[in-house]
Amino acid sequence: MRRSPLGLAGGGVAVAMILGQPLQAQEQKLYNEYGPQFENCGDDSLDRVLKDGITLGESNVAPHSMLDPATNTASGIDVEINQAVADWLGIKDVRYEWPQWAEQIPSLLSKRTDVIAQNIHVNPERVKVISFSGPAWWYGPVVLVEKGNPDGIKSYDDLKGKDVGALAGSAAEAYLRRIGANTTTFKSEVEELQSLSQGRVKYVVEDDVVFTVFDKANPGHNIEALWNIAAPEDIVYGGGYGAARYGFRKEDCMLRTAYSVALGELRNNGTVSAILAKYGLSDRNLVWFKLNP
């Protein structure tokens, strides 16, 4: 009987069976969307925020991050994850700025903020100007249409050449332009969804979790989410809908590295899971999953 180095008969097959891992998973090709960027490590960015505090850039988009104007209180998935990171790192003074989404990168580069703390995804254009933390959580895009899907949209390819709404500066906007859609951009998801509801645009591509919040808050609306449409691999892998991360100036390598270590610990110890559950999500949103249930 052949024995593996672990002393188990059958080698990898037995190990896979013990771990409850499907055998076909061993053949899965895994994708690394973002490699190491340690060129500037040794800078003082971590020491600076430990001493002077940190300014987080959020955008008022539920459920990612929200600002209650009556109490000036911040809440949301990204707000709570970033606060947990700050606590883990020992950052005592946490401040917020609330630029529009399209102004997040300019605000970071001008040093108005220290972190793009409204989650941001890797795409080729962004990698040229900022760096990214390790993964925090995951969600995907969804195509939104008038209820009943009168034009019979069946795939993202069907959006080519059509007028499609998206949030300005978003991964959805970049993808739609790349596939040849005529993109109408909006400053906020509220304006975007109102325009779709009122027929000013016929289609929108938006974050699935944003629509879920809208759907619960607006019973009887006339928008349909096409959950049966699979997200193309090129919108997920390097196309702007991979892992939800946080953004940093390229020179702030120590801060970014510390953030990434903190996120790894908080994902591992259940903190991120608890935050996701608080906003109606689950551990399914910790890793990439197929979007056509």
State what each model feature region is.
Residues W138-V145, K216-S260, D283-P293:
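Periplasmic-binding protein-like
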Residues V85, L108-L109, L159, L196-S197, ...:
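Hydrophobic residues within well-ordered alpha-helices
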Residues M1-G10:
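Bacterial N-terminal signal peptides that target proteins for export
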Residues Q26-N40, V79-W88, N149, D163, ...:
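Extended ligand-binding regions for polar small-molecule ligands
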Residues N119-K128, R178, K202-G240:
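A ligand-binding cleft/hinge motif common to bilobed small-molecule-binding domains
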Residues Q83, V94-D158, E233-I235:
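Acidic, polar ligand-binding/catalytic clefts
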Residues N60-P63, N72-W88, I120-H121, Y139-Q194, ...:
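Bilobed "Venus flytrap"/periplasmic-binding protein-like clamshell domains
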